[in-house]
Amino acid sequence: MRTLWQHCHAATMTEGRYSVIEDAAIVTSAGLIEWIGPRGDVPPVTADRVVDLGGAWVTPGLIDCHTHAVFGGNRSGEFEQRLQGVSYAEIAAQGGGIASTVRATRAASEDALLASARQRVQALMRDGVTTIEIKSGYGLDLENERKMLRVARRLGEELPVTVRSTCLAAHALPPEYTGRADDYIDHICEQMLPALAAEGLVDAVDAFCEHLAFSPAQVERLFIKARGLGLPVKLHAEQLSSLHGSSLAARYQALSADHLEFMTEEDAIAMAKAGTVAVLLPGAFYFLRETQLPPMDALRRHGVKIALASDLNPGTSPGLSLRLMLNMGCTCFRMTPEEALAGVTLHAATALGLGHSHGSLEVGKVADFVAWRIERPADLSYWLGGDLPKRVVRLGHEISN
């Protein structure tokens, strides 16, 4: 069905800029954008349906390119403890922290994980999200990593949202491998990753490169295996210290390196040369009350593409609003509203390997867009909350009104 969407203003986000078309119209057909431009220039095509958007601003559908949306349990009790002065180390010694999420995730059935994750993903969708990445990483063995990735696939089948699944088995050391990190990396490379990839559950491979997780050398072994299986890689890097994980990621043409508070100018140069996207996660920065800012000037100076994401997870960023992350990106990281919007559209698409098909309003790309109740694009970063999406369209079909 061909649909003509008109009486709107479009922030197309081509080349990562607002690239505004005033009094715009969009023609969609077969799930794609067939034409976009000024309303007065609409080509003489026969539309099966004409939709008046009432002067709304239209942007690409939002893309949350870094989430841990599938998990069991609840860690709000730890939040209370931390506010009372209990350290993370003390919480971990009591069996809390990521270990508690691993236990709860392992204990939960696939259907239970699906039900809880569905609510979180739907909350993001109500914010205008049409594409989301979901990582595993709370199973830490083949059976439970498979369970998490199956849930991610099922969410993409059951909900009107595009889901990309990332294997993050190298997220933390499982209790059965205490003191044997190298053995665990071997297990991921030799057993887990080949099996999960063969089952079609993996779109990319991620790891956590940090003193409290895995070393650059261990991550590199994982990257070599992933690339050998034809899978792109991503990396949690430079969140708590500088191990030059982002440079390692760039060496393997990673789709993205994420967090990056402690990255250096050398790392930024390497990422720029490789085309690796910097995914900034202000929710975790805020929730943990961190003070080390990502090097925004270096990222801009060297032309690194910058994305923003929610980092939705139970321990460090229980954020169910990607629009809130737009504001945090501006207020915490000194991004401009234009940079922030590019960070959840075109650059987020690139961070998922979807830059050719998603993230901007261009002919031939998927017809994913949101019509907003706003006066100008900067309002999306300005307002804290509010029911701003007027219509959400995915693959040319309206999914909310």
Swiss-Prot record:
The superkingdom listed in its UniProt entry is Bacteria
Where does this protein act, in terms of pathway? Answer: Amino-acid degradation; L-histidine degradation into L-glutamate; N-formimidoyl-L-glutamate from L-histidine: step 3/3
Question: What GO molecular function terms would the record report?
Answer: imidazolonepropionase activity; iron ion binding; zinc ion binding
Co-factor(s):
Zn(2+); Fe(3+)
Binding residues for Fe(3+), per the UniProt record?
Answer: H66, H68, H236, D311
Tell me the Gene Ontology biological-process terms attached to this UniProt entry.
Answer: L-histidine catabolic process to glutamate and formamide; L-histidine catabolic process to glutamate and formate
Write down what this protein is called.
Imidazolonepropionase
Which organism does this record belong to? Pseudomonas entomophila (strain L48)
Source species taxonomy: Bacteria, Pseudomonadati, Pseudomonadota, Gammaproteobacteria, Pseudomonadales
